[in-house]
Amino acid sequence: MLLSTHLLFVITTLVTSLLHPIDGHAVKRSGSLQQVTDFGDNPTNVGMYIYVPNNLASNPGIVVAIHYCTGTGPGYYGDSPYATLSEQYGFIVIYPSSPYSGGCWDVSSQATLTHNGGGNSNSIANMVTWTISKYGADSSKVFVTGSSSGAMMTNVMAATYPELFAAATVYSGVSAGCFYSNTNQVDGWNSTCAQGDVITTPEHWASIAEAMYSGYSGSRPRMQIYHGSIDTTLYPQNYYETCKQWAGVFGYDYSAPEKTEANTPQTNYETTIWGDSLQGIFATGVGHTVPIHGDKDMEWFGFA
């Protein structure tokens, strides 16, 4: 790990995340954030926090919202819009909290990159299954999202536990497996990946994701990928590599998307659509990280 680079990642992520505007809503939070410690096997001691709105829907959906480096579950509850949105749409929000001192997620070890491998991803998956059972949640309406390090983990969750999630939104992350450590370092930093120098084919990226749950042939979550053009923490090439990965997984021709829409969802954002299961949203002039578009997330998840 290059310490100076890692510190830059931590500091930049913290500052930009705190400055990001989020969607404003008239609906106010009326529930309260609660810590859960008995959700089952927790091999890496990941913290679990949950927000249950007062107007909880019958058979509610679930959104797993994963924080950035230096963050915590309670911190992401405070500066992301999902708890407020849950009051409007009646879903439950799970906020995992990193067990590591820097607040980043382990997206580098073999354990976390393997289905039921005993890593961070395993702990988060167990939070989901506990919540479905506890609250009678609709297992077909479970979604995952995250920013920066949390976006990396979102891609990992989509690859390691595709059976759990219907859709995902990824705010400024890297491809699943891009941070892989060949020395099996837990919570390791990968400068080569961060700087956009891990470049390969859609087919190769797909094979990396698919190997995380070997033999799985079921449905996979629809993916929506956001990235900024002037991101100097996780360089913009990571946007293209992530889109390649999921295009490969879904069998889309990465080089021939269905369409590209300028100034969508807002000015200077360009949306590329490969098919029903994959959209990429590239934000010109935006750094690290792209602000959360909560209303658009609700549309992608099917709540709105």
UniProtKB/Swiss-Prot annotation:
It catalyses: Deacetylation of xylans and xylo-oligosaccharides. It holds the Pfam family Esterase_PHB. The keyword Lyase does not apply. The active site is at S148. One of its GO terms (cellular component) is extracellular region. Residues 1-24 form the signal peptide. It is found in: Secreted. One of its GO terms (biological process) is xylan catabolic process. Keywords: Carbohydrate metabolism, Cellulose degradation, Glycoprotein, Hydrolase, Polysaccharide degradation, Secreted, Serine esterase, Signal. It comes from the Eukaryota. InterPro entries: AB_hydrolase_fold, Esterase_phb, Plant_Biomass_Hydrol_Est. Activity is decreased at temperatures higher than 40 degrees Celsius. Glycans are attached at N190. Pathway: Glycan degradation; xylan degradation. Acetylxylan esterase involved in the hydrolysis of xylan, a major structural heterogeneous polysaccharide found in plant biomass representing the second most abundant polysaccharide in the biosphere, after cellulose. Degrades acetylated xylans by cleaving acetyl side groups from the hetero-xylan backbone. This is Acetylxylan esterase A.
